[in-house]
Amino acid sequence: MDTIIATHELTKIFSGRAVVNRVNLSVPQGAIFALLGGNGAGKSTTIKMLTGLLPADAGTATILGEDCWADAIDLRYRVGYVPERPRFYDWMTVRDIGWFTAGFHEAGFAPRYADLVQRFRLDPAARLKTLSKGGYAKVGLALALAPDPEVLILDEPTSGLDLFIRREFLASMVELAGAGRTILLSSHGIAEVERVASHVGFMAEGRLLLAASIEELRKRIVRVRLHFDGLPPDPADLGQVLQFETSGRLWQAVLQDPNRLALDDLRQQTGIRDLEEMPLCLEEIYTALLTRFHRPEGVQATSNGRVRKSEIRDQKSEVRSKNRPGSFFPDF
């Protein structure tokens, strides 16, 4: 599958701080790629470099094989862009802003814009200043789609919209991707984009924590839950540990890239009961990735706080000590 959007070690520095730090992205043709993260994660700055509004301080960014900064003018006719807070001449009507913008584009823009206005159920005679947030966002999307772009980039497109409009807006993205367009959108509303995204990338503090297709994510990050008798298993033997906790005889861990052979062996071990492996939703994955990103080396995080790796060894030693000849019976 062709790669439409690509970055390599993309970096942007403001005031001596890397707000985008060596980001590597690969977005295939026809994908709906959701760039997810909280405010200040670096999503908007990444998008500004992709749309030619900011030069990169290091690394590269390309769309359709063209450099996003050096070839920005050529890409303007092939890439539609809707910023987080679009601003138009609010004294114009919906029809006027289309007529005005058509002067900067090739023939065909005006009739496509008129069709989109009708499709989005906008009143052509309504002044922009009278539109709701949802209506204003639809005007921005119509202007971005009217040039018939191959790629669509949306920065927080559902910010400030009510629930019904957000769902309607995101559903329209599926139609556009089905028609062959490649879409990259940023959002901090992780749960709402899960229903439409085919690929996701998680960002925090300028870094890309993980990027993959939804299908791949379901396999790469899982929650393993079990009950144990005797010695608790060491989660570090089963893959990269993002989260881990025990409560009594209940043991559970969130693992990235689980070791399948080790998990199969664990199922056969005496004293291991009710082992379950479950996929996570995007919000749970992002929480687990942030937990791993923020904790110091040598420390494992749980939902109850931080636990050092040695705690598992100490727990095992305690069990062995309780089972030595002459000791008290284990209080299991």
At which residue positions do the language-model features occur?
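ABC transporter nucleotide-binding domains
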Residues: 2-204, 209-210
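Detector for intrinsically disordered, low-structure N-terminal pre-sequences
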Residues: 18-22, 26, 298-300, 306, ...
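A broad structural signal for short, well-ordered beta-strand segments within beta-sheet-rich domains
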Residues: 22, 221, 241-242, 272-274
